[in-house]
Every structure is written in structure tokens, then in C-alpha cells.
Amino acid sequence: MSLYLKAEKIQSWRVLIMACAGFIFNTTEFVPVAMLSDIAQSFDMQTADTGLMMTVYAWTVLIMSLPAMLATGNMERKSLLIKLFIIFIVGHILSVIAWNFWILLLARMCIALAHSVFWSITASLVMRISPKHKKTQALGMLAIGTALATILGLPIGRIVGQLVGWRVTFGIIAVLALSIMFLIIRLLPNLPSKNAGSIASLPLLAKRPLLLWLYVTTAIVISAHFTAYTYIEPFMIDVGHLDPNFATAVLLVFGFSGIAASLLFNRLYRFAPTKFIVVSMSLLMFSLLLLLFSTKTIIAMFSLVFIWGIGISCIGLSLQMRVLKLAPDATDVATAIYSGIFNAGIGAGALFGNLATTYLGLNEIGYTGAALGLIGFIIFITTHLKYRHTFLLQNK
């Protein structure tokens, strides 16, 4: 094997490790969605109230993403990743032993702190450690890792939670995180901070209207998705009257849609980025609009969830890629802001879902999400038409 091929193989393994890291970070962020009922029962709470775990986690990421990124901006990236994994593991140990809901929330905030920095640096790191001619594919691999969190992480987390308790699910995530940390220590090279940006980057980014409106679009569209997705488990059981085992299968289908979205992104996005985003947003809106209707048959629900998953996964990939394109001189800071705003959308969506469930009824979460999605869609189209020449100039 030539030295070039050997080096490329090592680089591919490094990308795979980061994809695995993305897998566990995404798993732990969303696995409560699959266990809300069990956690609520454990602490003698209403399911809608335990859904606020998602809000607290997401808003911790929102608040901490930029300050934590600026504080660690000059740190060597491998050592930073190791420190993040230590915080992540400690948070999960605390989740396992949590003796009341408030301690569990504290543990989730600890994990969210690690999350806030991890996702701020990961996309740019993956592109740095990947083979030169496989940058987009590397980002797609990272996306597959996060999609697998939905395919494997959420359903398995739910099954484990049902069999032996939700605490064991968090314990298993801690063990997996420890294993990945050892692989990072072993295989990743030292990675000096590069094009991370600093506090001086903020005024420059603030002068890029297309980027700012992209952040606004992100917040609204992600809120739309999580208004319904946060409460998908009780929706399927209480509104759709599905057996809990079928509810697990629906989550599995949602995860497989993420793999399909990653493949579509790799093949199609580079040819027509804006059209790709528009179609993805349309899929999300129509899926949310038809969510209640899909409960009439199991096939309809499975089909709709698959399309819904493709839409939201493609949106996440596309918007992140566009942020990197619009801020090549301050990738980590721009991505930190994106990560914070993305999680603001998660938190807001969980809150909107809670309000919709409380005041309108659980069956209305799809319509509420669709209305938000329409607002985000209109903002994206309007700003693209206004600033499309700027985007074309920046991508020549």
C-alpha cells in the first residue's frame, strides 16, 4: 500500500471516530424523547412537564455555545475534545444516580455544556482531518453518525429503558463515550486551533445579512420541527393509539430517513443548494401539516415519518454547510452561533409543544409546527431573493 493510500485510510478512520462521537452526542440529546413517559413515571410527574428536559438542555447550549467557544478558541483541539468527553461522562454518571428531577436537570446541563463546544468545532474539524478530495463526504459521514443516533440510539435507548430502566440507558452512553475518548487519544493528531475566529469576528459576522437571516431561519424551522417531535412518543401512543412497540418502530423509521437524507445531500446539494433547502423545508411543512391525518393507518404514519425525517435531516445539513460557506474566516465562531441558535430552536420547539399540548391538545402539535415552518420558509425565500447576489459572489 502506498504512503498516500495509507494516509488516506488513517484520515478516513479519524472521520469515522468523529462520526461515532457525533452519534453519542446526538443520542444523548434526543434519547429523552423516547423515554419521557418512563422518566415522568419515575419522578411522579406529568409527561408534558418532563419534556422541559429538552428545553433546559437546548437553552444551556444556546447560552454557552458562543462564550464557551470564545473561551476555548485558542486551545489545541485534541486536548479540548478529551476535556469535553470527561465533562460529558461525568454528566451521565450524575444522570444515572439522579435522586430527583432537579438533579437530572443539573446533569443534563453539564452534558449540554460539553455539547455546546463539541458541535461548535466538529464540522470544521472533520473537514480538516478528512482526505482533501472528500470534504463533503466527510461532512456526510458525520451526518450519518448523527442519523444513526435516531436509528439505533433512540430505539435502543427506549428498549433498554423499558426493560431495565432509563438510568441504564444513560449509563451505557457513558461507557460508549469512554471508549470513543480512548480512540480519540490514540488516533487523532494534535490539531492546533485554525480559523476559529475570536470576539473580534463578531462585528464582521454581524455585517453579513444573509448569515444573520440564515440564523433566524434556523431558529424558526428547528422550532417547528421540535414542536411536534419532542412529543412524538406520547402523540403516537395517546393520539395514534399505537402499541408502545410500534412507537419504537416509528422512531426507527425516522432514523433510517436520516441515512437517506445524508445520501441525498452528498449526491444533490452541490448542484442546486438553494433548491435543495426549499424542497427540504417543503417536506417538513407538509409532514407536520399531515401528522394528525397520518394516524388513521400505520402505513400512513410510517410513510409520513420517513418523509418528515428526510426533510429535517436535509435542512440541518444544508444550513450548516451554508454557514461554513458564509463564514470561512471564522468557522468555529460562526458554527458556535449556529449551534446555539439551533438549540434555541430545539428549546423553543419543546416549549411550544408543551404549550400546544396544554392549551390546545396533543393532537394539535403538528398544525402548530407547520405554522412555524411556514414562517421560516417565507423568511428563507424572501432573504434569498434579496441577497442571492451576495451569496453567489461569496461562493465563486
From Swiss-Prot:
Pfam families: MFS_1
A single Gene Ontology CC term: plasma membrane
One GO BP annotation of this record: transmembrane transport
NCBIfam families attached to this UniProt entry: PRK03545.1
Source organism phylogeny: Bacteria, Pseudomonadati, Pseudomonadota, Gammaproteobacteria, Pasteurellales
Membrane topology: Multi-pass membrane protein
Species assigned in the record: Haemophilus influenzae (strain ATCC 51907 / DSM 11121 / KW20 / Rd)
Subcellular location: Cell inner membrane
Alphabetic keyword roster: Cell inner membrane, Cell membrane, Membrane, Sugar transport, Transmembrane, Transmembrane helix, Transport
Membrane-crossing segments per the record: 15-35, 51-71, 84-104, 109-129, 137-157, 168-188, 209-229, 245-265, 273-293, 297-317, 333-353, 365-385
Source organism, top-level taxon: Bacteria
InterPro entries: MFS, MFS_dom, MFS_Efflux_Transporters, MFS_trans_sf, Sugar_effux_transptr_put
Protein family: Belongs to the major facilitator superfamily. SotB (TC 2.A.1.2) family.
Transcription regulation among keywords: no
Described function: Involved in the efflux of sugars. The physiological role may be the reduction of the intracellular concentration of toxic sugars or sugar metabolites.
Signal peptide: none
Any GO MF annotation of the entry: transmembrane transporter activity
Full protein name: Probable sugar efflux transporter
